[in-house]
Amino acid sequence: KVSMQFVIQTMEFLHKGGRCSGLTYLLGNKFSIHPIVRLENGKMSVHSLVRGKDLTKGLTKMVEEFKTQFSNDNVDFSFPIMIPHVTGDYGVNKIEHELKDLVGEKMLLPVEASGIICCHCGENTVGLGYMLKNNLLEK
């Protein structure tokens, strides 16, 4: 029942760690593609891809998905909404700005991402994590 996703600035660390092929890495950098990775059942998988020079479109997509869950009354507010990041101050500020009027500033908790996220995703990775009332996979 945890929704945790990250938008990744560069696929360099995914490539170095063997998580993506050389061709994927090359095309991703050439066309400024940023993967949005979702953690499901303890495994990282690509949820979607966004294009752009920075993380803005990816952050917007994650926030829109949160707002969809919020409008469906599927967010469990007995837990904080976490914003894990790896040196991603811009992304943290953007997510906080988008969500503070919706959920309140006290519910938002920026945290440093774990070592696994740091190693696989690299710098400027920003995530959004929250608890759901109903599991996404049950639908």
Where are the predicted features?
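Mixed-charge interfacial surface used for oligomerization/domain docking
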Residues: 1-139
